[in-house]
């Protein structure tokens, strides 16, 4: 689809900015604020753990991840194949950018959403995670702030923490052919942001606010996070943590056998 291709090009441009400015460093700091909204904590369930949950826990518990190299390759390939990858060569290197198909489906249906992204530059470099915020409406909002409310916390992201200017576009929504406006912003994911994504997945209710606050006449739009976002975040977290904890050889074998779409420069 044309629009998905345009979005992929935008996301890949973000990856290029990261590669040229950060080199091999995945630990890039970006400002964010997290406000405690409630002290209530929901009880954990006995459901089977996702790979990212295991890998975020104590070191001795990571033994639950397969020790056999070929099994590690298979698990990493499965996680990577749950994400749609886009490949582009650029001056000085190349990159793979991965986004869950759930995010692309949200876009096609005109649903404002969170867009978790994984950027891969090769087996010798740790992956980089990004968070995108995609607002789709009837008119441009000139978005400068995004708020995410979970059961326990409010996460606020201002435009000073975005790594590029807010990108604007127009798209046609299926199946009625309605024309909508789209605004997207991206930021590097810090450790706090990864914690926030886990909180979002685990929260029973998640509200999104897309706002223009840097004005005497503020404008904002509130909506519920699409349910598909939970799977999208889970897909990217699994791919990110499995890749992060894999050896260079396992990474290379997994990357050699995944599908991707080449993006024209």
Q: Language-model segments: which ranges?
A:
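A generic "folded-domain core" signal
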Residues: 23-265
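Bacterial N-terminal signal peptides that target proteins for export
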Residues: 1-11
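C-terminal motif of bacterial Sec signal peptides marking the signal peptidase cleavage site
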Residues: 17-21
């Amino acid at each position: 689809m044309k629009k998905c291709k345009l979005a992929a090009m935008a996301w890949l441009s973000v990856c290029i900015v990261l590669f040229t400015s950060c080199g091999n460093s995945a630990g890039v700091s970006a400002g964010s604020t997290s406000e405690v909204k409630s002290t209530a904590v929901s009880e954990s369930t006995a459901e089977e753990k996702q790979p990212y949950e295991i890998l975020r826990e104590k070191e001795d518990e990571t033994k639950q991840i397969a020790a056999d190299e070929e099994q590690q390759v298979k698990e990493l390939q499965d996680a990577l194949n749950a994400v749609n990858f886009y490949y582009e060569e650029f001056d000085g290197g190349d990159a793979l950018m991965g986004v869950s198909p759930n995010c692309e489906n949200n876009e096609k249906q005109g649903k404002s959403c969170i867009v978790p992204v994984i950027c891969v530059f090769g087996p010798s470099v740790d992956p980089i995670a990004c968070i995108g915020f995609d607002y789709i409406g009837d008119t441009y909002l000139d978005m400068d702030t995004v708020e995410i409310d979970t059961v326990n916390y409010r996460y606020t992201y201002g435009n000073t923490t975005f790594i590029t200017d807010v990108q604007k576009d127009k798209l046609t929504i299926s199946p009625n052919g309605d024309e909508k406006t789209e605004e997207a912003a991206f930021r590097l994911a810090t450790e706090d942001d990864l914690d926030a994504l886990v909180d979002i997945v685990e929260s029973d209710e998640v509200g999104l606010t897309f706002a223009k606050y840097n004005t005497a006449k503020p404008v904002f739009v509130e909506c519920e996070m699409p349910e598909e976002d939970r799977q999208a975040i889970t897909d990217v977290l699994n791919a990110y943590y499995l890749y992060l904890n894999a050896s260079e050889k396992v990474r290379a074998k997994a990357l050699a056998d995944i599908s991707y779409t080449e993006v024209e420069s």
